[in-house]
Amino acid sequence: KDCKRESNTFPGICITKPPCRKACIREKFTDGHCSKILRRCLCTKPC
């Protein structure tokens, strides 16, 4: 199961995955993606 949390460091609107993923990895998560509706950067890691 993956735990999901909004990135604390990603600025602005999330349009492409790579910069979001990079921010998430810096925050000790394993991956990150953009939310479809609100365009937020969401970080994921195994719980």
UniProtKB/Swiss-Prot annotation:
A 1,2-diacyl-sn-glycero-3-phosphate 2 binds at residues 4, 33. Gene3D superfamilies: Knottin, scorpion toxin-like. It comes from the Eukaryota. Changing residue 26 to A: Retains double helix formation and membrane disrupting activity, although no fibrils are formed. Disulfide bonds join 3-47, 14-34, 20-41, 24-43. SUPFAM superfamilies: Scorpion toxin-like. One of its GO terms (cellular component) is vacuole. This is Defensin NsD7. The lineage of its organism: Eukaryota, Viridiplantae, Streptophyta, Embryophyta, Tracheophyta.
